[in-house]
Amino acid sequence: MLNISKPLSASQAQTYHEKEFTAAEQNYWKQGDTIQGEWHGKLAAEFGLSGGVGAEEFARLSEGQHPETGKQLVLHRVVHEYKNADGKMVSPVEHRAGWDATFSAPKSISLTALVGGDDRVREAHREAVNVALNELERYTQARIGGNRPAETTGQFVAAKFEHDTARPVDGYSAPQLHTHVVIFNMTERDNGKMRALQPHSLFESQQFATAVYQSHLTYKLRELGYEIEPGKSGAPDVRGYTQDYLDASSPRRQQIEEALSRSGFTGPEAAQIAAHNTRDKKVTLSPDQILAAHKQIADEFGNQADKVVAEARERRNEQRPDNDRRQQVREAVTFARDKGFEREAVVDERALYVDALRRGMGEMTYPEVRASFEARVASGEFKEIAGNGHEAGRRFTTAATIKAENEIVQKVQGGQNSAPQIMSIESAVPLSESRPHFNAAQRRVIEEVLISRDQVQGLQGRAGSGKTSVLETIRQGAEQNGYAVEGFAPTSRAAKQLRDAGIKADTLQRFIAGGGLQAAGDPARKHLYMVDESSLASTQQMRDFLNKIGPHDKVLLIGDTRQHQGVDAGKPFEQLQEAGMKTAQLDQIVRQKDTALLKAVEHLSNNETTVGIEMLSQQGRITVIVDPQERIAAIAKSYAAHPENTLIVSPDNASRRAINQAVRQELQALGIVDKTDHSMRVLTPRNDMTGADREWASRYQAGDVLHYTRGSKEHGIEPRSYAQVVTTNAKENLVTVRKQDGQQVTYDPSRLRGIAAYREIEREFAIGEKIQFTAPNRDLQVANRDLGTIQQIDKDETISVRMDGPKDRIVRFDPNEARHFDHGYAVTSHSSQGLTSERVLVNMDTEVHPELMSNRFAYVSVSRASHDAQIYTNNAASLAASLSHDVSKASAVTFGNAQSSSAQQGLALAVR
C-alpha cells in the first residue's frame, strides 16, 4: 500500500537522505556501501536527471532549487512568527521540501521475494511502483496562491529508494520490501513557471495509487505462477504461508498494534504516531547476519517461502485458463459504477478506478480498466460534470442519475399552483393565532403551509426551532379539512418523533416498498404526507416516493439543508429548493435557553462557522487538551460529575468507543454503574459495504453475521433470521453461511436481496449503564439510535432497559436474540441529529479525517444543547478552520436559477 508522510522540511529531508534512505545498514540490496536511489517523474527528465540520486542534487531540490544550477525556483515560506528576547517579531523561513510516499509490499510478498529469493517478485514490485507513480503524477497540481484554484500540471520530480527490511525490534530487522519516494515540493505550470506543489491532490490520489500498485503487482505475480488471495485489508497476499509464520516475521507490525491497543486509538494517523514512538535504535548488522536471521525463522516454520516459490515455478508452466478478459473488465467497471453512484451522484474518476481495480484484482491491468471506462464515457453512459476549477481529476455522473434528478424537479414544478388550499387564509390565521406561545416564525409557517396551492412544498427548519409543535398544529388543520395525515422519514427515530406529534408515521423505505399506511383506509381519499428529515433522503427515495402519491395528495417536505445529509446519493431536498420549490422558513431558534449559546448556534446555523466558534471561545466553552487520552479522561470526568441530561458527541466511532469506555469506568468508580460486568456479543454494522459490495463474495469475511430481511425459500433461510459467514469462494462468487439451526448453506450473494452485514464484537455491560440501540426493533417499539438505561440484568441475561423520553417505558429483551445495542454515553454527530440534551460535551479533534470535522458537525453537535455546550479540542488555533470544511454532497444537475421553469435549463449548467 501507499502511505504519504506529513511534509518534510529541507533539513529533515536531507537528514533522512543521509541516514535513512541511502544507508546500507539492514538493507542487503545495495550498490557498494550505499543505496543509490533512482530519479522519477517528467520534471526529473526536464532537469536532465537520470540514474542514481546524487546527494547534492537531492539537497538542492529539497531547498526548492534547480538541481544543477542551484537557482531558487520555489520561494521559502514563513514557518511561524514569534517574539525574540528584545520583543521584536521574528519570521524564520524554512522550505517545505516535499513528502515521503512509501509503497510497501504485503508481508507474504516480501517473504517470497526476500526469503524465498525470487528476484522476479522484487522486479514486479519495482514495476508496480513505477506504474502507480506515473498515475499519481498525472494528478499533480500547482499551488497558485490567494483564493485562486490549484492548477493541474501532471508533472513532478521524485527520488526513489528501495529498502528490504523493517525497523528493528529487539535487534531483529524483519524482511519488508518497500520503496521510499520523496516527491519534491515543486511543479511546472503551462507558462513555464515553477510553483510549490498542492499536497491536497497527492492525498486525494493516495487510495487510487495504492489500488494501481496492488493491482499491477497482483497481475504480475499471477503471471509468475503465484496464487493470490485477498488479505484482511483487501491487499493481495501470496497463498501458502501460515499466520504464525507471518506474525513471527512481522514483529514491527505487532509492536505498533500493541501501542495502538494501549492508546485506544485507531486509524492511519494514530498508527503513524505509534510507529514513531516505538522505534528501536538503529542496529548495524551485515547483510549476511540479516539473511541468517531470516533463515533461522524460516527454518522454524518449515521453510514455507522456498515451497511457495518452487510451486509457483511449476504452476507457471501449466496453461492458464483463457478467461474472457473483456467481459471481466466490463464487469469490474459496472461494479465500480454501481458502488460509487449508490452513495454519490457525482464521483471522481479515481474512485471509480479504485473500485474497478479492486473488483478485478490480478485479473486485468489498469490500462484495460481505463480503456473500458473511456469507451463507456464515449457511449454516453457516464457524463463528465463541469468542475469549479480546482479538481485534479475529472468528475462523472451517469445518465440514469441525471434522469432521476430531472424527474423529481419536473414532478414538483408540475404541481405548483395547481393544488387546492388545505385551508383558506381566513381560517388559517385564527388557527395559528390560537397558539399564543408560538413565535412569529412558527405562526407564519403554519399559515404558509395551510394556504399553499402547491402540491409539494418545503419547510426549512433550523435545529431547535419548535418544529414538532408546528407540525402538530398543521396536522390538526389538515384533518379538520378532510385530509388523512401520514408521516414518513428516512430514519426510524425521525418517524417516531412524527408520531410524538400525533401523526401516524413510518419509515420512508416501508412506504416505498409497501405502498404506505393508508391511514384513512381509503386510497382515494386525499392525503397530506409529511416527510421529516428530508435532507437525509436520497434521490432514488425521493423519486420513488413522489411517484407513489396520488393526484389529490399534498406533500410537505421537512428538513434542514445545513444539518447532516444522507448516506446514499443525492440531495433532493436542497436541490428542490434551488429549483424553485416554495419553502416556508422556520428560522427562529427556541431550543437554547442561554442567550450567549443561542447567538453562537445561530451563527453556526448560518454557516458562519468561524464566528460561531470564536463566540464559543469567548464564552469560555472551549478547553484545549492536546493529548487524546487526557482529553478523553477529562470528558469522562465532566460527564460523570453531572450525568443527568448530558450527552457526549464525538466525530468518529473510534473516539466514541474510547470515550464510552472511559465514562463507564468513571461511573463504576463512583458507584453510579454497577461494578459487575456482563460480557455480551453485540453486532456492529459493516457500514463500509454498499449494495454492490453485498453481491460480491470477496467483500465478506469469515465471522461476519448476516441478517436476512427477506430470506430465501430456495436456501431455507427464514425472513428476519441471522447466519454467520463460514467461508467465501471468490473465484465462484459463493458464500457459505451457518444458519441459526446449525446447518450450512452456500449461495451466490448476487442472487439474494435484503441482506445486512455485521461484525460480532464483545462488550461489557452493567446495571445502570446507558445504552444506545443500533437498529430498529419493531417488537420492542425501539427506533435506531434510541437511548435508554439498563435497570436489571437477570440470571438468564434478560435485560430490562428504561427508555429515554417523556414516557416512562421499560423494554425487556434477550441480548442473545436482540444484539443491536452499544454503550450510549457518547454518540457520533450523525447519531445525535434529532436529539436534545441540557448539556452537551463535544470532542473536536482536528487530527481526525477532514470529512468528519466539518461545518455540519459543528452545527449539529453544538445545537443539541439547550443550556450548555462544552468543547474539548487538541488545537484551538486550527479548530475554526477545520470545522469550516464543507462536506456537502454534489448533485448531477445544478439548478442555478431558482425561478427556472424547466429542469433541462439546469442540466446545461452542470454537464459537459
Language-model-detected regions and their locations in the chain:
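Conserved ATP-binding/catalytic motifs of P-loop helicase motor domains
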Residues: 1-912
